[in-house]
Amino acid sequence: MTSLKNDVFLRALQRQRTPYTPVWMMRQAGRYLPEYRETRKKAGSFMDLCKNTDLATEVTLQPLDRFPLDAAILFSDILTIPDAMGLGLYFEEGEGPKFERTLREESDIRKLAVPDIGSELRYVTDAVSQIRRALDGRVPLIGFSGSPWTLATYMVEGRGGTDFLTIKQMAYARPDLLHHILSVTAQAVTAYLNAQIAAGAQAVMIFDSWGGALSHYAYQEFSLQYMQQIVSGLTKESEGRVVPSIVFTKGGGLWLESQAETGADALGLDWTISLGEARKRVGSKVALQGNMDPAILLSTPEAVEKEVARILADYGIGNGHVFNLGHGITQFTPHENAEAMIKAVHAISSKYHL
C-alpha cells in the first residue's frame, strides 16, 4: 500500500521523537458535521451506514477533508461483534443501541461462539481496505473494537445507559457464566482486530467504555485481564511497521499502572485525571492519549485554545502524547470549535518537542 506522508501519530504512540503533538478526536466522524448528517440521511439508518462500504469510507474521510487531523478512525460501531454473534443489534432514535436477544440464561451463554469474522464482519474489513486506498497515505488509519467487558454489558443488559445491575449480579453470583462470555468475546475481539490489521489498519484501539463502573478488584478480574489477552494476541507488525495498540478505560484513572502492564503501546485518558500526573505514574512505559473534556468544545474558540494550552503544558516537554478528547465529541459541538482545538494543538505544541 501507499507509504505514509504523515506518520506523526504512529511515532507518538511509540514515544518516538515528533515535531509536534498529533491530534485526532474520538467520534470525529459524527453528527456535529453537517456533511455527516447528509450522508446518514442517504444511508437510511446508522447500521446501514456502517454496512455500506462506500458511505462508511465517505464519512471516515469527512473530518479529514475539513480539519488537519493526524489520524483517521474507521467509521463503525463497537457492537458489531455481538451483532455478528446473532444477538440482533438495532437502534431506536434517541435511545441508543439495543439487542433483540440477551445473554442471561446459562443455555444461551454456553452456546455463545466466536463468529466467522471473514463472512459476518466482512463489511468492516472491506471498509478498512477501501478507506486505506482512499487515504492514499495521507494519515494512518485506526481500527477499533469494544472491550470484552463493555461488549458484555450490552449483551447481558440488552441496552446501554443502565446501572449494570444484571451483569454485576452475574459477576458475583455466577462468575463462571460471565467469564465464559468474556473469554469467547476476547477471542472474537482478537480475531476481529487482527482482521482489521490485515485489511490495512495501522493502529488499533480497545474501547473499555464501561470499565469505570467496576470496583477495583472486579476491574482486574472482569475487564483488564481480557484486554491483556487481546493485546498479547494482536498482530504486532504489518507492512514493515509496528502496529501500535491503545487501551482506553473511561473512568479508569485509578488503574493506570495495571493498564500499563497489558502490553499496550498507549493508554487513553478521560478528563478526570491530570495528564501530568498520569505521565509521572506511567509515562516511562506507555504513551498517553487525551484528555480534553468534550464539553469544553461547547464554549468558545478562545476558551478551547486556553484549555489546549493548559493540557499541553500539563504534559510538558517531550514525546509520547497524542492529543484527544477524554471521550467522544458530542453532536452539539460547533465545528468551528473543533477546528480551533486542532489548530491550537499544532500551533502550540511544537515548543514542547525540542
UniProtKB/Swiss-Prot annotation:
Q: Which InterPro entries match?
A: UROD/MetE-like_sf, Uroporphyrinogen_deCO2ase_HemE, Uroporphyrinogen_deCOase
Cross-referenced CDD domains, in alphabetical order?
URO-D
Q: Which organism is it from?
A: Methylobacillus flagellatus (strain ATCC 51484 / DSM 6875 / VKM B-1610 / KT)
Question: For this protein, what is any one GO molecular function term?
Answer: uroporphyrinogen decarboxylase activity
Q: Tell me which Gene3D superfamilies the record gives.
A: 3.20.20.210
Q: Is Protease one of the keywords UniProt gives this record?
A: no
SUPFAM superfamilies attached to this UniProt entry: UROD/MetE-like
Identify the pathway. Answer: Porphyrin-containing compound metabolism; protoporphyrin-IX biosynthesis; coproporphyrinogen-III from 5-aminolevulinate: step 4/4
Record's GO cellular component terms: cytosol
Q: Where in the cell is it found?
A: Cytoplasm
Which residues are annotated as site, described as Transition state stabilizer?
A: D77
Name a Pfam family for this protein: URO-D
Superkingdom of the source? Bacteria
**Role description:** Catalyzes the decarboxylation of four acetate groups of uroporphyrinogen-III to yield coproporphyrinogen-III.
Q: Which PROSITE patterns match?
A: UROD_1 (PS00906), UROD_2 (PS00907)
Q: Which Gene Ontology BP terms does the record give? A: protoporphyrinogen IX biosynthetic process from glutamate
The answer to whether the entry has keyword Cytoplasm is yes
Record: residues binding substrate: R27, Q28, A29, G30, R31, D77, Y154, S209, H327
Task: Please give the catalytic activity noted in the UniProt record.
Answer: uroporphyrinogen III + 4 H(+) = coproporphyrinogen III + 4 CO2
Q: What is its main location?
A: cytoplasm
Q: What is its EC number?
A: 4.1.1.37
How is this protein named in the record? Answer: Uroporphyrinogen decarboxylase
Q: Which family does it belong to?
A: Belongs to the uroporphyrinogen decarboxylase family.
Under the subunit heading, UniProt states: Homodimer.
Q: Where in the chain are disulfide-linked cysteines found?
A: none
Swiss-Prot/TrEMBL keywords: Cytoplasm, Decarboxylase, Lyase, Porphyrin biosynthesis
